[in-house]
Amino acid sequence: MTVNRKKFIHTLSFSLAALWVQGGRMLHARTKDDARISDFCRKLKPIGRALELPGYYVWCNSPIEAPDGKTHVFFSRWKADLGMSGWIKGSEIAHAVADAPDKPFEVLETVLAPRGTGFWDATTCHNPLIKKIGNTYYLFYMGNSNGKTNTKRIGLATSSSLDGPWTRTDAPILLPGAAGAWDDHCTTNPAWVRGKDGRNWLYYKSWNTHDYETTKGPIRGNRKYGVAFADKPEGPYEKYVHNPVIDFSAKGANRQFEDAFVWREGDKFKMIARDMGVFNHEVGLIMESDDGLHWSEPQIAFQPLSHYVQEPPAPAHLKRYGRLERPMLLLEDDQPAWLFGASQGGKYQTSSAFIFKCEV
């Protein structure tokens, strides 16, 4: 068979050019995809599940290091017979301790339980966030009074020791906005940080009631984040006039997020959270800011749980199986050292903590 040399060279050149273009596209796509993955995400090493408790769902695992070097966690739990939705109408906040984040945890006690009729936290205590500010431990949390979302309010308990006793505020420390405001439905998911101005900055999640009641689709309403400021951790808090500071609704498709944790790293404010459609519903988000008010476009903070571990197929009663929620950090010298999250599944097919080491 005779091959025309000129035709062969032309065909080869065209093929190489096509491969170069295709390769370029592939490289561009890979580079574009890689740009979505944060350095934080690349440094995560999965440790595994913790706080798998028989008869309970476990959620919202907030860690802190004690003066003796032990790791304490304040977490939400509710009876398994309430199902996954029991967090809204029967959650309590408990306390556990371990020699280190990757060692077994011992549950010590319930520290905050719903107080019953007449109290703002009558029906649930959830979303714990433990902080040491000065010589006092501050346990921020969300409570409600009717077992529904529209009475979710951020409150506070304080103690001079991680072992208590804990004194609660008589009223919430941050209330929803006026009717019609973007945040008129509730205040929840507290995230505290010391601002560059030395004041107490409290980030919170909320949404609009009308949107919540009229939105069609699997997720009702659009969750946004605002911030409020106070001279003291217990308040009174004054909301930032240009709230919300993070709002993904303009991206379309009801994109939103929740479960933010905020910290200061050098001159930057940083935030880690759970994605609700910006990339997908299975990953985490990470953002940064120079001033805590204007935030960068998000990158991926962590992958779906299946990226790190192989688990049994999802049981029918767990609809949010396979993803990490409620990300919380244990910091060392203001740097992320450990990531604590919550995930459905585990030994008792309820939910538990899931821990990562943040490798330097």
Question: Which stretches of residues belong to each language-model region?
Answer:
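Carbohydrate-active catalytic/glycan-binding domains of CAZyme proteins
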Residues: 2-360
